[in-house]
Amino acid sequence: MDFSQTQFHTIVGGQVGFAVPLIVAVTGHRDLVAEEIPAIRERVSKFLTDLRDEYPDRGVSVMSALAEGADQLVATEALRLGIPLIAPLPMERKLYIRDFETIKVQENFEFLSSRAAETYELPVTPGNTIESISEYGDARDQQYAQLGVFLCAHCHILLALWDGKDNDKLGGTGQVVRFHHDDVMPGYTPEATGSGLILADDESDLVYHIVCSRDRPDGQPAEGLEVGDYSWFSLDKDEPRSKTLPESHRRVFRFTSEFSKDAIRYSDKISDDAWPLMTKEDHAVLPVGLRDIDHVFRAADWLAIHYQKGMMFALKSTHFLAMLMGLMYIAYSDMLPMRIFLYAFLGFFVLATAIHTIGNRRSWHRKYLDYRTLAEGLRVQLYWAAAGVNSGSKTKYTHDTFLQTQDPDLGWIRNVMRVAGTECDASDYSAQAGLDFTLREWLGDADSGQLGYFRRKGEELERRHRRTEQMAKIVLWVGFAAISLFVLMSADLGELVRDPVVVLMGVMLLFVGVRQSYSFSIADAELIKQYEFMFRIFS
């Protein structure tokens, strides 16, 4: 199938192609001190350049609301460096532009927004209306609070041009930084809200803080901070501020970059062979943002299948070679003690070790599991978005609730999902067409969708598991019959058939043992239970 059009026209995180960019969101003060701007600009440029150089396989995109001051400064530097710009606006453009006090700032906003790769207008917050947010006051401030939450939820690094002071201004820089760390924004989040992640290691808390002052009375930085200072600022208990990227985040970024590198390497095959969740007919009636999720899903799904083939090759090969090693041992010890059998044994051992080593170095098993997990997370994310399902919280998105209790290293999967779902999360979609699509394609019936998939796979695994058990029973009874005949035979006849019977039993037991080991390695019994459970859920 030729889906090349999807590859070249789908923009994910401000970029085309299958790589998932590193997203830097901007929060900062509007009233920067003019004398400090050159140094701040230089530091921002150095920061973005270093990131781009360190992660060439995925690239960097900047997310900025293009407000006066810090937002426009960073956006300008990003464009100068050739870094894609994403512009989420807190409200409709015609309402937002009223917050720009001078013609020069408005013109700069218009210029920057015209150069943005993607621009979103966030929906009206729950309980408010277009009329209420048109007036200055709490309702309008709620839009800025929503913007701050959106930036935090859809970036990998929050770039804060900040004086370091906490304040009570709803949606202000101090509150956005606090929300990024603690998931708390007084006046917007419920009082009981805390970190949504059960794990101690939260990959979404990373702030790059550039200290600045403000052009107002008492505008100096917080005590202990100096203008021009910069640091990585996270929830690390031992070293919350550091000059180098914390290792836990570096590890997450490394896995995401590895996915992007693989996606780029196999981009042509993904374009030609990967199977999408949406057809061209679906594109015409469903939100455009779903294409982003589908685009990343195709890469993750194809790569999962690709590395599954490598993993299964290694698994089957090593088990087959183990069986051959056993046969060589039996042949040498019970048939003909020829050295060629020993050489063959060693050769099979070396070959099995080489295959196992190559599989480990290329991470076939880990990548298969990780990419399959990512693909299934994206599948759920797409169908939830199409059906208009949300997490039940105005401060949480689908990716925030995924894999909360799993290995912290899987945080990179949320990193990918937060980029793929950005455009969908920027809209408030709820239509019957999306719900019908989800029920038809995801739920399906006995022959289609997830219902049909789990039924078919469950039956397939059940048949394979049954064959393994039947084989073990056959060998058991054949062995019992052979030993019984051996006991009942005369001494002379028994001596004649003793060696062939022993060899036959050894070979049969070896074959069954390898078969059961293979079945255990691919977890047939456990998968049968899981597929039966999922089939009942979708039923």
Residue ranges, per PLM feature:
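Membrane-interfacial terminal anchoring regions of lipid-handling membrane enzymes
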Residues: 175, 183-185, 194-276
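Conserved non-transmembrane functional hotspots
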Residues: 236-539
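Acidic/glycine-enriched connector segments
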Residues: 2-222, 226
